[in-house]
């Protein structure tokens, strides 16, 4: 992988800029957009970016930082899933708290936004409070978003309880978009002003990158990643009017800026120092780019990856046709084809050959994987194991220089697992998935030195690219994610079965 981003330079620049911003206030409410942990999108489009860069940045500032986590009551009620982890938003709040504590960051509280006594949310509140987590309940803001006089009054933000904080930087984060981070920040600004405290608001969002051209693949990759939110990158007209400088922001921030500016001015009683949405941000990621060509190429690959993901989401019913069509338009805008992703064609060609050889009507599930040296290997589904498991075994055998005809896992281990699935669990599909095969491999490694050598090659798969000719099971998708393999799928199910495909 060609490095295009200087992680250390970015950390230095970013921490310095946040501290400069907080110097203007007694307290800074910093809205954190995107992912605090495991930001694999940023890692993919900015080769050299650390997926945990943001949390390491906060760890660096830990003496000055405390964290407030927002979650929208409606998302808890409908069991909204965080796509990259496959867990619900309420569970992700718990995960966030644990992970923040690991980095020695103080979690102040959880804010339940737009709370109206929803039953599942009330259970979640009880769970948090009984584990010693402070919870604040915020209702919908009366008058929002147009009636500024009502919003900035005791009927509006005044209805929300004041969140007691002690440190100069309050990071407001959430499991995902639409969780009420901005409303929580503004509500706090209102209460701080009532108490005579000079508090400020800033936004930390990595994408779009304000000082990179509008049509740069890096910014277009952000549109591809948020195609379901219908985010569109735009030139910040407010910034152009104020400074005669071209910067990039996205439609929601630009559209909401006039009202946001009026709310801040109503709260503080003076003219806002922010002349544009770009002014509000503290993002310095653009200054860490050291190889623009490497970033462009990585971003193009991410656009293709997102296109495949949206296609699969459409097939599963998670995305509408408009969203899928939009992802196609983004591909066309950058003049990209599906086969510009190197692993796509080898997977499809292998699948087509197998289909011809077996004379099957259904698509033959094949997974192709590209190693760091450019070698592409394939694995096919069989009665013994599925395609994802097969390609991982083939890859580690290749990396360990183990001959194809040598078995890494003894039938003595495999057969009892398959018997357990078929005879005890009465499962229809008894071929082993990726996790099951790797578990069997780890058992074999205890007595088989060759299996141990192969096991030791698994970390070399991190950052590798893969493509499947059919939609992978959730179990395989999760396991490949844990291995650090970026996988895409053609939007086809492996069979006509409805339930047993999952």
From Swiss-Prot:
InterPro entries (alphabetical): DUF1846, DUF1846_C, DUF1846_N
Gene3D superfamilies assigned: dip2346 domain like, Domain of unknown function (DUF1846), C-terminal subdomain
Stretches of the chain forming a coiled coil according to its record: none
Pfam families for this protein: DUF1846, DUF1846_C
Transmembrane segments: none
Assigned protein family: Belongs to the UPF0371 family.
Name of the protein in question: UPF0371 protein CLH_2534
């Amino acid at each position: 992988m060609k490095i295009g981003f200087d992680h250390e330079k970015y950390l230095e620049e970013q921490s310095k800029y946040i501290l400069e911003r907080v110097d203007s206030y007694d307290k800074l409410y910093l809205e954190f957009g995107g992912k605090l942990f495991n930001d694999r999108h940023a890692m993919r489009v900015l080769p050299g970016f650390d997926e945990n860069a943001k949390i390491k940045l906060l760890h660096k500032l830990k003496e000055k930082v405390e964290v407030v986590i927002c979650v929208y009551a409606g998302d808890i009620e409908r069991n909204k899933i965080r796509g990259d982890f496959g867990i619900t938003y309420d569970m992700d709040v718990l995960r966030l708290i644990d992970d923040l504590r690991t980095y020695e960051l103080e979690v102040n509280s959880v804010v339940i936004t737009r709370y109206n006594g929803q039953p599942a949310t009330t259970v979640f509140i009880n769970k948090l409070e009984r584990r010693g987590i402070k919870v604040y309940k915020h209702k919908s803001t009366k008058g929002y978003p147009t009636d500024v006089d009502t919003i900035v009054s005791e009927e509006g933000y005044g209805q929300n309880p004041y969140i007691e904080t002690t440190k100069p930087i309050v990071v407001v984060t959430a499991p995902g978009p639409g969780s009420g981070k901005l409303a929580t920040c503004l509500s706090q600004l209102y209460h701080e002003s009532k108490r005579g405290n000079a508090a400020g608001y800033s936004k930390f969002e990595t994408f779009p990158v304000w000082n990179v051209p509008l049509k740069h693949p890096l910014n277009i990759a952000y549109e591809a990643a948020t195609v379901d939110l219908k985010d569109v990158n735009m030139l910040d007209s407010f910034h152009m009017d104020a400074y005669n400088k071209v910067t990039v922001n996205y439609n929601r921030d630009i559209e909401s800026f006039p009202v946001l500016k009026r709310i801040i001015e109503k709260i503080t009683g003076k003219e806002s120092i922010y002349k544009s949405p770009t002014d509000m941000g503290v993002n310095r990621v653009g200054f860490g780019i050291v190889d623009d060509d490497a970033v462009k190429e990585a971003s193009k690959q991410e656009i293709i990856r997102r296109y495949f993901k949206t296609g699969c989401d459409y097939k599963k019913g998670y995305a509408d046709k408009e969203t899928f069509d939009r992802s196609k338009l983004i591909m066309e805008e950058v003049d990209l084809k599906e086969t510009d992703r190197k692993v796509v064609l080898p997977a499809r060609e292998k699948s087509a050959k197998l289909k011809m050889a077996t004379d099957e009507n259904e698509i033959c599930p094949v997974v192709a994987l590209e190693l760091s040296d450019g070698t592409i290997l394939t694995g096919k589904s069989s009665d013994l194991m599925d395609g994802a498991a097969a390609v991982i075994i083939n890859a580690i055998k290749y990396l360990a220089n183990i001959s194809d005809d040598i078995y890494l896992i003894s039938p003595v281990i495999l057969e009892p697992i398959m018997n357990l699935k078929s005879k005890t669990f009465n499962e229809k599909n008894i071929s082993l998935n990726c996790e099951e095969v790797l578990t069997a491999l780890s058992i074999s490694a205890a007595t088989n030195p060759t299996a141990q050598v192969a096991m030791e090659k698994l970390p070399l798969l991190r950052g590798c690219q893969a493509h499947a000719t059919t939609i992978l099971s959730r179990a395989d998708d999760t396991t490949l994610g844990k291995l650090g393999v970026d996988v895409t799928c053609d939007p086809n199910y492996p069979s006509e079965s409805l339930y047993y495909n999952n």
